[in-house]
Amino acid sequence: MEEFQRYIELDRSWQYNFFYPLIFQEYIYGFAYDHGLNKSILLENAGDKKYSLLIVKRLITRMYQQNHLSLSANHSNQNDFFGHKHKKNLYYQIISEGFAVIVEIPFSLLLISYLEAKEKKIVKSHNLQSIHSIFPFFEDKFLHLNFLLEILIPYPIHLEILVQTLRYWVKDASSLHLLRFFLYEYRNWNSLITPQKSISFFSKRNQRLFLFLYNFYVCEYESIFLFLCNQSSHLRSTSFGALLERIYFYGKLEYLVKVKTFTNTQDFRVILWLFKDPFLHYVRYRGKSILASKGTSLLMHKWKYYLINFWQCHFSLWSQPRRIYINRLSKHSLDFMGFFSSVRLNSSVVRSQMVENSFLIDNPIKKFDTIVRIIPLVGSLAKAKFCTVLGHPISKSVWTDLLDSDIIDRFGRICRNLSHYYSGSSRKKSLYRIKYILRLSCARTLARKHKSTVRAFLKRLGSEFLEEFFTEEEKVLSLILPRDSSISRGLYRGPFWYLDIICIHDLANYE
């Protein structure tokens, strides 16, 4: 426990105490709205889209008055001291954007110091910024693992939890009080949290501030959780001495620092602390995380209930056990970042000849397989009006006013982006269907614009129309290798993982 406390104090050594005066500085709101500092955006007596720093100060003052807070609960007309309620919401948004800039200052400084320290090292890992780098990691590690925990990170039930988490880093009590008043004063803040969704529950109107608070909450959770993981992979269980995992124990004897004869249960429990699990891996994207291990089912159940108690004790959150799933990798497909990932066995039969006898040896080989979730992806295309819910291409009527080159460029860019992201799929047939939908939807859009048929339009455009829908890797491979070669066919069918993808395409982001 003392070591844990020292770790917390070390990581929180950068604490800032003087943020509150920055809230009343005009240039902060200039930074928030990306305006030049030589042009004031907070002017009195301007239009509805112009802001007044004086009114912002008055709003902050009013939020500290208890009678004003009591009136806001009843939605009284007297509470609308701006004359128009939509203006009041506008100024709440201004304060949230400005406050987001202020609370990001210490973490921006931490990031700068981290990057400066990183530049001094020889080894650089810029490619790890790509979200595609997760899947080569899966291919390398998951073949040797047995179980995984699929964890839906619980969202804060109350925004007060976010404020309390932030107070460990920001010691400016005035700023924290203002943030707390602001969250309570904003009349629609209860609607910002939707229980049915994980990370998309925050209001788009105050996205920067609330996403910062949520990301900070996740960072706080991961910093403590991963520290505990590094200390010991085995969770000591004093009340379940009869359920010690003997198989797992004998498999890990090589990782003991010192082996000695166990004379009693107490000695055994002490030596158990020496075990380290080198096969415990943690991955997260947005509100979903994966904890994979080579351990047994009993060990994974220990982790599950440990996480539930951890959230309950540290964050006062009650996480339902069904938000954490325990699955065996050999029997379950992992639904993560738009892919179905699984470990399947490929049978390799080898014939062995010994004198007059011959044998057939069946060698099962594990392979990491990734396929595209085609049904949700077609649903996203249907929602964007590229096809029907059954996958039949339709024209994009809202684009018929554009130039032909712009229409083709838009469809081609969407097709290339989706193919770029889903290039890691082990089976390309799903991607061919998506290309077919977008290509025919483009043809129908152009034919509708020119009041012609699709057949006649495709005949007039010829092969040049299809070139817009070639993906980058297809163009490169077609220049290097002929399509009829065996090497080229294997590369066309194999997965491609790119190291320049930092986010999921909007059409692929259907979670």
From Swiss-Prot:
GO molecular function: RNA binding
Compartments it resides in: Plastid, Chloroplast
Transmembrane annotation, as ranges: none
Broad class of where this protein is predominantly found: plastid
Keyword vocabulary terms for this entry: Chloroplast, mRNA processing, Plastid, RNA-binding, tRNA processing
One cellular-component annotation, GO: chloroplast
Domain of life assignment: Eukaryota
Family the entry assigns: Belongs to the intron maturase 2 family. MatK subfamily.
Annotated protein name in UniProt: Maturase K
InterPro entries assigned to the protein according to its UniProt record, in alphabetical order: Domain_X, Maturase_MatK, Maturase_MatK_N
Pfam families membership: Intron_maturas2, MatK_N
Function as written in the Swiss-Prot or TrEMBL entry: Usually encoded in the trnK tRNA gene intron. Probably assists in splicing its own and other chloroplast group II introns.
Biological processes per GO annotation: mRNA processing; RNA splicing; tRNA processing
